[in-house]
């Protein structure tokens, strides 16, 4: 197998591929243009979106030429893949702002030049609908489209005609990139398989050449939960939506059984180093988790920020060092009040989702103020609890928050 493809396979990226042997031989002979698309439904990607772009970085290291297709036009329709209901229709202004934000985010992570980023509005916004149906729609079988899991699943919930067009438009994207950029490979999550193979088929029919598609597994944790979700919601790559400290801690808290898998997927460490790290046992496995958390934080947020939150994590768990990057909640006593119920403070700071959960944690001995366990659910915080205008609130073993006056 081609070296680049073999690397993706060994690191756990490869799920399905059209004509793998033919693609491998082609990549042995020449450096190919390949692409992954991203819709602009949000101002930020989350960690679950990152896999295709990490794979792109591996392929780029082997000399292949990436294109990131910004789906500013297809976002106006919405991809039904993996959805049980129609996406909310966004305004053009929101879509354009999201497109710029995501492009900047991916440029920072991948270090790809601006020329690697293309918007599909370049060709989709001015399509003539009648000509599109005559030239492109004629190559699509409704029966075949309905055989794909994306559409089969949605038929039970309702599928709008506008969403039904999505596969044609994504296939047209691939066709256009093949036509103007000689792009020969589309990569994406496995939920995109139907859209990708339809594009491969359209290129064969329209251009008379073979193109290829490759998908990655949808990453889940060993507990069955979807990768990229946390108690605080989606693990966004934008630090204003999900703090860098919490991002680091998300990976620092990886379950033992996921460490090796995530080291292969979310870092660029060499195979022998990963195998060595993965053999850590007992408490030493925490070191492997620290390495994982540092490496992926470095990729997404840069080495300087990764070092800061790593030091903050060490300070929180070991009780010494620079604590300034531990998340904080700005608090002030209201009016003449000189105390506040701890339960209320926990809820205000969002370290717990409800007062009942706060009471449960206190009663089970899982809440600490400045390292001292809280015994009473009616415990009050006073000014005397603050040292240098802050206190440390810990919930459970892993949640730390500085309360700052």
UniProtKB/Swiss-Prot annotation:
Record-listed E.C. numbers? 6.1.1.1
GO cellular component terms?
Answer: cytosol
Binding positions (ATP): 229
Q: Which Gene3D superfamilies match?
A: HUPs, RNA-binding S4 domain, Tyrosyl-Transfer RNA Synthetase
Catalysed reactions listed for this entry: tRNA(Tyr) + L-tyrosine + ATP = L-tyrosyl-tRNA(Tyr) + AMP + diphosphate + H(+)
The short motif 'HIGH' region is annotated over 40-49
Please provide the Gene Ontology terms (biological process) for this protein: tyrosyl-tRNA aminoacylation
Pfam families attached here? SYY_C-terminal, tRNA-synt_1b
Where does it mainly reside? cytoplasm
Q: State the superkingdom.
A: Bacteria
Domain S4 RNA-binding span(s) in chain numbering? 340-404
Subcellular localization is given as: Cytoplasm
- Give the molecular function GO annotations: ATP binding; RNA binding; tyrosine-tRNA ligase activity
UniProt-annotated binding residues for L-tyrosine: 35, 166, 170
List the keywords (alphabetical): Aminoacyl-tRNA synthetase, ATP-binding, Cytoplasm, Ligase, Nucleotide-binding, Protein biosynthesis, RNA-binding
CDD domains in the cross-refs: S4, TyrRS_core
NCBIfam families from the entry? tyrS
Family statement drawn from the similarity comment of this UniProt entry: Belongs to the class-I aminoacyl-tRNA synthetase family. TyrS type 1 subfamily.
Described function: Catalyzes the attachment of tyrosine to tRNA(Tyr) in a two-step reaction: tyrosine is first activated by ATP to form Tyr-AMP and then transferred to the acceptor end of tRNA(Tyr).
- Database matches in HAMAP family: Tyr_tRNA_synth_type1
Q: How does it assemble?
A: Homodimer.
- Its name, as the record gives it, is Tyrosine--tRNA ligase
């Amino acid at each position: 197998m081609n070296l680049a493809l073999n690397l993706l396979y060994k690191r756990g990226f490869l799920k399905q591929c059209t004509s793998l042997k033919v693609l491998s031989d082609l990549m042995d002979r020449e450096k190919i243009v390949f692409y992954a698309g991203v819709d602009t439904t949000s101002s930020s990607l989350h960690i679950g979106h990152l896999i295709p772009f990490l794979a792109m970085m591996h392929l780029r290291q082997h000399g292949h030429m990436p294109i990131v297709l910004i789906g500013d036009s297809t976002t106006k329709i919405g991809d039904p893949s993996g959805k049980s209901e129609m996406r909310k229709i966004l305004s053009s202004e929101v879509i354009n702002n999201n497109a710029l934000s995501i492009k900047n985010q991916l440029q920072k992570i991948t270090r790809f030049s601006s020329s690697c980023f293309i918007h599909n509005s370049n060709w989709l916004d001015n399509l003539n609908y009648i000509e599109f149906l005559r030239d492109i729609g004629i190559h699509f079988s409704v029966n075949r489209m309905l055989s794909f899991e994306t559409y089969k699943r949605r038929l039970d919930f309702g599928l709008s005609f506008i969403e039904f067009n999505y596969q044609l438009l994504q296939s047209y994207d691939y066709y256009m990139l093949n036509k103007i950029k000689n792009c020969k490979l589309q990569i994406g999550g496995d939920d995109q398989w139907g859209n990708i193979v339809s594009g491969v088929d359209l290129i064969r029919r329209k251009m008379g050449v073979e193109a290829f598609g490759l998908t990655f597994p949808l990453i889940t944790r060993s507990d069955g939960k979807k990768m990229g979700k946390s108690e605080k919601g989606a693990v966004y790559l934008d630090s204003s939506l999900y703090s860098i400290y919490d991002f680091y801690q998300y990976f620092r808290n990886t379950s033992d059984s996921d460490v090796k898998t995530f080291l292969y997927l979310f870092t660029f460490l060499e195979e022998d180093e990963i195998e060595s790290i993965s053999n850590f046992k007992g408490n030493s496995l925490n070191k492997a988790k620290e390495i994982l958390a540092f490496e992926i934080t470095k990729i997404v947020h840069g080495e300087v920020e990764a070092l800061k939150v790593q030091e903050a994590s060490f300070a929180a768990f070991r009780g010494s060092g620079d604590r300034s990057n531990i998340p904080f909640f700005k608090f002030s006593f209201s009016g003449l009040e000189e105390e506040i119920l701890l339960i209320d403070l926990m809820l205000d700071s969002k370290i717990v989702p409800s007062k009942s959960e706060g009471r449960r944690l206190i009663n089970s001995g899982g809440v600490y103020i400045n390292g001292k366990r809280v015994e009473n659910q009616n415990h009050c915080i006073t000014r005397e609890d603050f040292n240098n205008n802050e206190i440390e609130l810990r919930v459970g073993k892993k949640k730390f928050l500085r309360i700052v006056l």
